[in-house]
């Protein structure tokens, strides 16, 4: 089977990560969450991770250039080229979308689908209010589920 290439977009708390895992189980495509990749790069103390962390610690968004570079590194990996991908949380901006388009053209990869997930704003607030993160592994979960 040919690798599939998907992008999931939607607000935080809509379930992009959950759907990415389900799509991996069904289609074999590698979920790539920008948040997870940030945490991994920070934990590994890479140059990009340290740079990203300097913004995160100040409560600022990580600049497009750093985000794009981190995601490009993963998208170019042998595993992702072999399995395909489900992007979660990337692209978030027009600049990131343009960079993704350029990168995929360079890799001779075409997106199969962009899926927009929608949710009632009140549900988003409820989900995010109960969202917690494990300090050891970085997993994000809802207080009601653990």
Language-model segments: which ranges?
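Glycine-rich phosphate-binding loop of ATP-dependent small-molecule kinases
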Residues: 1-146
